[in-house]
Each structure stands twice: as structure tokens, then as C-alpha cells.
From Swiss-Prot:
<comment type="similarity">
    <text>Belongs to the UBALD family.</text>
</comment>
<dbReference type="InterPro" id="IPR009060">
    <property type="entry name" value="UBA-like_sf"/>
</dbReference>
<protein>
    <recommendedName>
        <fullName>UBA-like domain-containing protein 2-B</fullName>
    </recommendedName>
</protein>
<feature type="region of interest" description="Disordered">
    <location>
        <begin position="119"/>
        <end position="165"/>
    </location>
</feature>
<dbReference type="InterPro" id="IPR054109">
    <property type="entry name" value="UBA_8"/>
</dbReference>
<dbReference type="Pfam" id="PF22566">
    <property type="entry name" value="UBA_8"/>
</dbReference>
<dbReference type="InterPro" id="IPR039310">
    <property type="entry name" value="UBALD1/2"/>
</dbReference>
Length: 165
């Protein structure tokens, strides 16, 4: 009975390994046997082996893991794919549906949340005494610190602001 339990335990470990690593059952069995059925050791060996294999550009046939949280994508390959995508996008004309789907329209305004220049912003009430200050672009800019202003500076600024009211 213990032999059957041992075989069952091994089969369960093989199945778990296949799910965790995304490889074939025969490869999982070989790795587990080589690691004396130590699951973590076999899993570590599998991922070290897959890193070596990808560095050697897949010289021998091997089952690569699926893209799971435990197995991030191969970043050099992903970067190469993105650079190819960028190159192919620049070769297309701007009227193609693919480039239109990936690019903003020609009249795209990054300040879409700001109000139009000739309309009052929505967040200020129309009767606000300061609303007119947002539409006149000739009012003087404040100078800081106040000590650096020439004499009469504060009076000039106040007179200019009073003149706008």
C-alpha cells in the first residue's frame, strides 16, 4: 500500500510542477527525480535551466514556461517586439485605422480639461468680482519678495488693479 501512496504522491507532485512551470509532464518527472522529489529544488532548477536556454537562443528543444506571475516575459524579446511595432507604425500613413487607434487625433489638446479661452471657467460663479481678472492678460505680474520692488511699486500695482475694476 505504501508503494501506491508513494506513486500517487509523485504523480500529484508532477501535476503540480506542470501547473507551476508550464512544462510537459515527462520533463517535470525528470526534474523532480533529479532533485530527489524536492519540489522547490526541481522548480528552481527548471527556471535556472530556462534562463540559460533563452540566453543561448534555444539551442536545444525545451519547454518554456507560460507567462504566469512566477514567470515574467522575456524582456529583451518584448523590447525588440515594441521597437518593431514602433518602426512599423511610423511606416504606415496616418489614415490607417491601426495608427488612428493608437495615436491621438491631429487636433488633440492635452489641456482638454481647461476651459476654452473666450469662456468663463465653470468653477467660478459669473458674479465673482475676480472673474474678470482671468480674462485680461495685461495686468502686472506680482514680484516677490516685496523688498525688491522699486519705490511706489505697491501703489502702482494697486492703482492698476483698481483701474481694472
Amino acid at each position: 500500500m505504501s508503494v501506491n501512496m508513494e506513486e500517487l504522491r509523485h504523480q500529484v507532485m508532477i501535476n503540480q510542477f506542470v501547473l507551476a512551470a508550464g512544462c510537459a509532464a515527462d520533463q517535470a518527472k525528470q526534474l523532480l527525480q533529479a532533485a530527489h522529489w524536492q519540489f522547490e529544488t526541481a522548480l528552481s532548477a527548471f527556471f535556472q535551466e530556462s534562463n540559460v536556454a533563452s540566453a543561448q537562443h534555444h539551442q536545444h528543444m525545451m519547454c518554456t514556461p507560460s507567462n504566469t506571475p512566477a514567470t515574467p516575459p522575456n524582456f529583451p524579446d518584448a523590447l525588440a517586439m515594441f521597437s518593431k511595432l514602433r518602426t512599423s507604425e511610423s511606416l504606415q500613413n496616418s489614415s490607417s485605422p491601426a495608427s488612428n487607434a493608437c495615436s491621438p487625433p491631429g487636433n488633440f489638446n492635452p489641456y482638454w480639461a481647461s476651459s476654452p479661452p473666450n469662456q468663463q471657467p465653470v468653477w467660478l460663479p459669473p458674479a465673482s468680482p475676480t472673474a474678470h481678472l482671468h480674462h485680461h492678460h495685461h495686468h502686472p505680474q506680482p514680484v516677490w519678495p516685496p523688498n525688491s520692488q522699486p519705490t511706489g511699486g505697491p501703489q502702482k500695482a494697486m492703482a492698476a488693479m483698481d483701474g481694472q475694476r
